[in-house]
Amino acid sequence: MKRLPRLALAAALFAGALTGIPSLAFAGNLPAAIDGAVTVMHTNDIHGSYKYSYNASKGTGTIGFDGLAVLYSAQSNAPDFLLDAGDTFHGQSFATMSEGKSIAELMNTFYANGYDATTPGNHDWSYGADKLRTMAGNGATSTPFAMLCANATSSNGVWSSSITKTLNRTWKDGEGSPTFNYKIKVGVVGAMDESLGSSLRADLVAGTSFSGAADAINAEAKRLREDEGCNVIVCIAHTLNAKTFAAKLVGVDTLVAGHEHINLDENVTGADGKPVRVVEAGSAFAEVGLLSIPYEYDTRGTETTNDDMVTVSAGDSDEKLYTAKDVDDLLADSNNQNILDEVRNNKIKPLDDAFESESNKVLGTSSTNYFYGEDAAGTHGWEMVRTTDLRPSKEGDTTKAQTIGHVICGSYLSLTGADPGLTSADLAIENAGGIRGGIAAGNVTAGDVIAISPYGNTLETWTMTGADFLAALEHSLEISDKCNDSYELQQAYVAAGHTEQEAQDMYKWPDDSGSVLSFGGINVTIDWTQSEGKRIVSATLTKDGSTLDPAKTYTVATNNYIITNTTDFPTFANAKKLTEWGTCEAALRALIGQDDWEHKVASLAGTISFSSAESPAPHPTPTPEPSPKPGTTITQITTKKTAGKLAATGDRTPTVVGACLIGGIVIIVLGIIWKRRR
């Protein structure tokens, strides 16, 4: 009788033990390890680009949020994460006019559940730290994307460091067989390189400080693994050099990077000796990346998951880079076209309409025409900012009237001098290629300003010596001189009956014509009869009338594009960056919104004077062709370079005279030879 309880106990223990053994259905089938992957679709540095476009002839385009929806939906399994690595809300006017809110709304709602997270880029702080920190809530209908910056501390609010997501996975051994369910937990941590914080306007980040980004990432990665039980750690970071940054990381599997505007897919050994997969997807929504991070789930041969292990092989990750061409290919499927149309019509169009309404708002009025071409439409294209704006308007003029270049440079000087707590600019420059329109007398709208400065370039201040600044201006005048040669030839060709486009095709602008500089903060006297290096006769600052000192260091306001052109302007390599001020277009908008802004430009930008009332002697030009008549054949003018200038060969008189002289000499020589033989 006493044995029965013992047998019952043994039976109970045996039955209990069975709960830890795979069911008979899995006997021999459940693998010891299951292979899987975490997929991350990612963008970076879109700079306010938002709408799909594709130029088949050039093979280039923009993916945009509508194109991104097509790529997202085309995956056999929806990506586990949609992440962004910064410089997202600032750049194109579509973004800046709403202070980034339009982009934030699209990130939240464009398709599916929208983005999971982003991290700030250096340009994203242009609206202020508080607006950036709360940007994620704009337009959100459910859970908004996360704004992650683990190394930012603010007195006005808390910055999020990371998010986690548990991925439910299922393994199945063929059709009709039982399934095995397990989970993978992923942590995403974000940060911005602390060195980028030093270039931000102090007023925009007041109350915010930045600690070491790599240290902050490592600490959060450790917490996510130990306290949150994360199996995979993904880092999104806006950093000066992604590979250098990755080498400092500990416990991170993947770095999705931004800032360098490059396509990157490499393994870097982290500070813990383990591989970190580093990816970056270009810029301006030209590319979108899809990263697959492989893992091995160790089942230990049982259905229980309490002690299962996950091994991540980050070094074996696979990166796929998509372009607008891939979207174009997918649009051959009507289902994909429907997705694109749905996003464009229901998500993008309402924001486009709001943007158009804002663009039509009048900012101020102008009493003067500030054209960038010979008329408001810019006939010939940029000819004024490349040539005539730097020359006397007509014989007898000694001072140039205000130009569109002066207006732009005046706006830079105005904005950088508006905050007494920051270093104001002494000088300003803008390159011709960055000026895409002019201002006509009358009302000036926000759209007019966007047309002038459409690229979303950033206004920055840099320090450089007076000598380096003068060297740049001198070389700019040399480029302008070559542009003037082309322009004179174009004018003659048009006068002969050709179209403006034919003239430009025949006599092309120099390749570096977009580098001609407009300048402000300085009164300059130019002598066009001199050679490069000697044309600037005098240069005095508008702020105090002092002569520009070659040995002194000055603060120069410029767009972020031209200052990096050390090919045309080698002395720019010596410049040191100080501060970022927002978009160039925003500076111009702020100026024109002020009362009596034209008077302010006149006092800030300065003047261009000429040491002689006459322009330099004109360079040789081709003899203009007669206007073509029906049925006649026109012979193309041929030109050649002579001593660096275009010389005309349309007049053949010198050639004929020379040929006669040579022929006469030959006859005389032959006569002498014949006489001697006799």
Which role does the model predict for each range below?
Residues A659-R678:
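C-terminal membrane-anchoring or membrane-association module
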Residues S612-D651:
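C-terminal low-complexity, Ser/Thr- and acidic/Pro-rich disordered "stalk" regions positioned immediately N-terminal
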Residues T179-K183, Y295-N443, I592-P616:
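A short C-terminal boundary segment appended to hydrolase-like catalytic domains
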Residues G28-T323, I404-V407, S411, A428, ...:
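Acidic, metal/ion-coordinating pockets
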Residues M1-A8:
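Bacterial N-terminal signal peptides that target proteins for export
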Residues L18-I34, A647-T655, W674:
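Sec-dependent signal peptide cleavage junction
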Residues I34-T39, S49-S53, K58-I63, T143-N151, ...:
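Feature captures C-terminal
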